[in-house]
Amino acid sequence: SMGAATTMMTAGEDTPDQVVAFIEDCGYTSVWDIFSSELKLRFGMPEFPLMYTANLFAITKAGYSFKEASALNQVKKCEKPMLFIHGTADDFIPYEMMDILYQAKPGDNKEKITAPGAGHGEAMYLLGEEYWDDVFTFLE
């Protein structure tokens, strides 16, 4: 998920011609969204006050807001092809985040792979050879 976020954050920037496409596997929309989701899912806690306090701390100590760290905003600017991959049973990054990211990507140069029953980072293992066939087909 962190590699996917890094990929998507880069996708919205000017990249060299050698970068021809982006592939993300089990990525999240933003730091704010994933932290909020985890608070609810793991601890049954609302966003307020913890998220707001932690965000204020990040702003003062690190110089950025959790809402600024948004893969979603970067994907909206991506012009190169992008492949989105996610497992339906991911209990860390909600599967719905892939759909949000996919819809945000402009143009038709995008594809998605859904891995039924796959947990976080398990799509490659559950789909096996099909995973790699789809990835290499996308890159062609």
Residue locations for each model-derived region?
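Acidic catalytic loop of the alpha/beta-hydrolase fold
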Residues: 89-93, 121-122
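Hydrolase active-site cap/lid region
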Residues: 9-64
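Short alpha-helix in the alpha/beta-hydrolase fold that links the catalytic acid
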Residues: 71, 80, 94-103
